[in-house]
Amino acid sequence: MDTSHGDTRPGQDVRKWCVGVAVDTEGGKLYWTQKGPGNAGDGRIFRANIKIPKGQSPANRTDIELLYQKLPEPIDLDFDLANRTLYWTDRGDPPRGNTVNRAPMDAGPGAKDPEIVYNHLMEGIGLALDIKNNRMFMTDLGGSLYSCNLDGSNKKVLLFAKGNLTGVAYVEFPAK
């Protein structure tokens, strides 16, 4: 696929590579990150409808929305659907990289800059939210697992330097 003429879908151009994906089944939207070249400040977050609009194809769909741009290197993302908040890890250079960020899911043009809620990750990668208990978990390529409240308070290091950790998942099993 030729991505040289403003096409936002993944392709050979490193700016177009999709890194993280999250699905909002309630809202019918698919969100993804495109980190761009390393430490270039060219990362972006997009969304589109889960269902391709009638009469369109993946190559010509018109429902792709750019939510955030000029990010260091956005990687993984997750949602707080009740508060319509998008969270993501960013492994680019500080001060805005190696962070966990949050921002409104429904931001439009002129939206405020994303809020940094956690910093000092070592190439931040994985992210999982535990909305019920107001906390999140993050991993980094430095091999550490962290947790904190959704607002960034109550920071904890759960594992330190255990080898490259590239993802994390949180699952709560119902009581029997």
What name fits each language-model region?
Residues 17-19, 41, 70-75, 96, ...:
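Beta-rich catalytic cores
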Residues 39-49, 95-103, 144-147:
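Structural motif
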Residues 141-176:
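Blade-level signature of beta-propeller repeat domains, shared across WD40, Kelch, NHL, RCC1
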Residues 2-4, 9-15, 65-72, 116-122, ...:
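Surface loop/turn motifs at the tips and blade-to-blade linkers of beta-strand repeat domains
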Residues 26-28, 82-84, 132-134:
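Short coil/turn segments that connect the beta-strands within blades of beta-propeller domains
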Residues 31-33, 47, 87-89, 102, ...:
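Residue position within the beta-strands of beta-propeller blades
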Residues 21-23, 77-79, 127-129, 168-172:
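Hydrophobic core register within WD40 beta-propeller blades
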Residues 26, 35-40, 50, 82, ...:
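Short loop/turn segments immediately following the C-termini of beta-strands
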